[in-house]
């Protein structure tokens, strides 16, 4: 039994609150336990310069944490004048993950910006961001369909993400902050609803992991992501 009384293979309490803000074409407040992230999707006509004239769209993401998302205040990155390497890494991960949901050739020359703002952090902010932003992206697509009438549906399918870890030879699903800080290995996994992998990010701390342990973590991640995608479908009314 874990510190929050979950089983090793159990997700935290997950929720999605759609249409959380009124201005964005898509907005979702996603909660993975005590981790809460506001994900908004904004649609703009036009694409980056290197895509102009190609008839394709673009999807990109930004990520940030509110100053008091953690137990001590962190200075805003805007006040520091630069983004941290961690922030840049995470927002690239989110963008890559969400582009796997969409056939960009069917999006027209439109750009969708996904903004993921961490309101409260207790581990798994990047995986919560991917999973929540996927729903916001679908709501934004519906907005485009209503106003611009795309010739074909660009949606390929849902994606979701979860963290897994290895501690004392046992695999843990959906790590909170304390678990993430104390695990021998932590791994972030992003997958499609077809069970295909988009991203694997794994690191061992002090104690390397074996191939068998990697397989154990991936099996657990597949289970968790299948459950998350089922929850996404419920939230979307599918």
From Swiss-Prot:
InterPro entries (UniProt xref): ExoRNase_PH_dom1, ExoRNase_PH_dom2, ExoRNase_PH_dom2_sf, PNPase/RNase_PH_dom_sf, Ribosomal_Su5_D2-typ_SF, RNase_PH, RNase_PH_bac-type, RNase_PH_CS
Catalytically driven reaction(s): tRNA(n+1) + phosphate = tRNA(n) + a ribonucleoside 5'-diphosphate
One of the Pfam families matching this protein, by short name: RNase_PH
Annotated phosphate binding sites: 86, 124-126
Family the entry assigns: Belongs to the RNase PH family.
Biological role: Phosphorolytic 3'-5' exoribonuclease that plays an important role in tRNA 3'-end maturation. Removes nucleotide residues following the 3'-CCA terminus of tRNAs; can also add nucleotides to the ends of RNA molecules by using nucleoside diphosphates as substrates, but this may not be physiologically important. Probably plays a role in initiation of 16S rRNA degradation (leading to ribosome degradation) during starvation.
Entry protein name: Ribonuclease PH
């Amino acid at each position: 039994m874990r510190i929050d009384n979950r089983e090793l293979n159990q997700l935290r309490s997950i929720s999605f609150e759609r249409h959380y803000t009124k201005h964005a074409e898509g907005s979702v407040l996603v909660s993975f336990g005590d981790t809460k992230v506001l994900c908004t999707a904004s649609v703009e006509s036009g694409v980056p310069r290197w895509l102009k004239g190609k008839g394709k769209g673009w999807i990109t993401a930004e990520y940030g944490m509110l100053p008091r998302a953690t137990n001590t205040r962190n200075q805003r990155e805007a006040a520091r004048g630069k983004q941290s390497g961690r922030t840049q890494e995470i927002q690239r991960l989110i963008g890559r993950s969400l582009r796997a949901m969409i056939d960009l050739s069917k999006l027209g020359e439109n750009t969708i910006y996904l903004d993921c703002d961490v309101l409260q952090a207790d581990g798994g902010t990047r995986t919560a961001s991917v999973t929540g932003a996927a729903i916001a992206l679908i709501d934004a697509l519906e907005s485009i369909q209503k106003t611009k009438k795309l010739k074909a549906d660009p949606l390929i399918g849902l994606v979701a993400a979860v963290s897994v870890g290895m501690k004392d030879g046992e695999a843990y699903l959906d790590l909170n902050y304390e678990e993430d800080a104390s695990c021998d290995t932590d791994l972030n996994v992003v997958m499609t609803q077809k069970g295909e992998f988009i991203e694997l990010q794994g690191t061992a701390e002090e104690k390397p992991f074996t191939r068998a342990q990697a397989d154990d973590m991936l099996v657990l991640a597949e289970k968790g992501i299948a459950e998350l995608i089922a929850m996404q479908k419920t939230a979307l009314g599918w």
